[in-house]
């Protein structure tokens, strides 16, 4: 039909049907070769070949055929390196690499999407790039990416992720002022989970302590330390007692530590630090017997492989003098 009656309406319809078949087969190149061989008024323009080659590959991606999509998208980019859909293709290839945990390749491709200036996938590309850099422990780079994400994010989840990422990176890179600002910014979010809210208050309290503004940390420490089942709650309990101790408020420090011991925690390191601080309180009060009792008990029962043993030895050594 197509070759026998090339100018007829029937031939045009048949050619369109044939094109659909080749799209489904993901073989646009063969269709292009055939169409261009017909001569006459039949021309398969490069722009249409660009579009259809991409659409065939995109269909595979949308169906969940990641391996087929990867091959087809790669072929598209090789055939049309400056194609109209190169940014889309790079984004989908990046998503496939990310799903396969090929993070280095995913970051390279997400970066290409961002460099293209195409805004369609900008938000998700910044989100994934920041996540990859964070997972790679490249916190300085991740911090910059989270800043970009915060500036462009419209999705509520990405907005929260940007603020959370900024806060964590600031803390991990030893920037208490930045961490404080980021924590305050995150705490303005209306629908934070209890875990994230607790983490933000913990980071804020630690930032205040680093900035020598300990009194401002008290409210957060008191709130977080209500639940010593969490790692942040256990550390906050110890830090609260330490702040009281540093301010010569032995009574409140002892009360906090006794409550800590009574309620317990799965985080034995911070409980051990609490016992040592309690011994320090008794040493300062001249009650060496009580201090020695706590230290000896801790020495006999603590199983951790960290600096606790040395801290106990140091204090017991001083008590013998």
Provide a role label for each language-model segment.
Residues 1-321:
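Acidic, polar-rich low-complexity tracts and alpha-helical solenoid repeat scaffolds
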């Amino acid at each position: 039909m197509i070759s026998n009656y090339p100018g007829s309406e029937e031939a045009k319809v048949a050619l369109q049907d044939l094109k659909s078949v080749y799209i489904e087969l993901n073989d646009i190149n063969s269709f292009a070769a055939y169409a261009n061989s017909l001569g006459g008024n039949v021309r398969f323009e490069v722009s249409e070949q660009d579009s259809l080659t991409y659409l065939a590959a995109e269909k595979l991606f949308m169906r969940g055929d990641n391996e087929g999509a990867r091959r087809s998208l790669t072929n598209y980019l090789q055939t049309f390196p400056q194609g109209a859909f190169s940014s889309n293709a790079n984004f989908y290839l990046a998503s496939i690499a990310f799903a396969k945990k090929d993070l280095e390749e995913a970051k390279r491709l997400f970066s290409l999407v961002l460099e293209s200036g195409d805004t369609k996938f900008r938000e998700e590309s910044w989100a994934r790039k920041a996540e990859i850099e964070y997972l790679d422990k490249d916190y300085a780079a991740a911090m910059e990416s989270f800043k970009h994400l915060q500036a462009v994010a419209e999705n509520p989840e990405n907005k929260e992720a940007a603020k959370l990422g900024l806060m964590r990176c600031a803390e991990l890179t030893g920037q208490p002022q930045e961490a404080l600002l980021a924590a305050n910014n995150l705490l303005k979010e209306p629908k934070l989970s209890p875990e994230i809210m607790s983490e933000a208050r913990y980071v804020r309290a630690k930032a205040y302590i680093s900035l020598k503004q300990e009194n401002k940390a008290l409210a957060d420490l008191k709130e977080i330390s209500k639940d010593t089942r969490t790692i942040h709650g256990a550390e906050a309990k110890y830090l609260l007692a330490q702040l009281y101790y540093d301010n010569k408020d032995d009574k409140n420090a002892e009360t906090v530590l006794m409550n800590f011991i009574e309620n317990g925690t799965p985080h034995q390191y911070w409980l051990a630090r609490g016992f040592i601080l309690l011994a320090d309180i008794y040493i300062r009060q001249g009650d060496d017997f009580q201090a020695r009792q706590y230290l000896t008990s801790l020495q006999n029962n603590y199983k951790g492989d960290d600096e606790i043993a040395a801290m106990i030895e140091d204090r017991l050594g001083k008590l013998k003098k």
